[in-house]
Amino acid sequence: MTVRLAPLDYSDLKRCAELERILFAGDDPWSESTLRAELDHGHQYFGAYVEGVGLVGYAGISVLGTLRDAEASVHTIGVDPGWQGRGIGKALLRALLAVADEFAAPVFLEVRTDNEAALALYQAHGFGRIGLRRRYYQPSGADAYTMARPAVVGEKAQKDGTT
């Protein structure tokens, strides 16, 4: 199985919205129009593609600020349940972190407190818990941890002298 990561295309938004409904059924899954707005606003989104299958995962991040004072926020990571446990989520997260690292930006995210697989993934990539948001996810009322990873200086930031 070869998984290819590439920038997410507008033509994939219907599939992303379908995965949102599957993955986040008890909460408020993002619609196709919400995902379209994310791309329209210039946020970085990646798709995970398997030849002969198509899109099996997606992830997005925003970077706000300039190279010297940027801050990044992971907006979403989702992998088709039939493709979970194969390193696709890890590959998508690494792609997002590479974007943040080019801006030497700390990265923030929210994750359900009961999502043990995601918590382990984030902790393995340098994230630590910095807060708790009670009843963050609606309508389920599930709690979320706020997590952060300190800035890592990427190649672009090094070349521009931000270190």
Which residues does each predicted region cover?
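Conserved glycine-rich acetyl-CoA-binding loop
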Residues: 76, 80-94, 112-120, 124-125, ...
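Extreme N-terminal starter segment of soluble prokaryotic enzymes
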Residues: 2-5
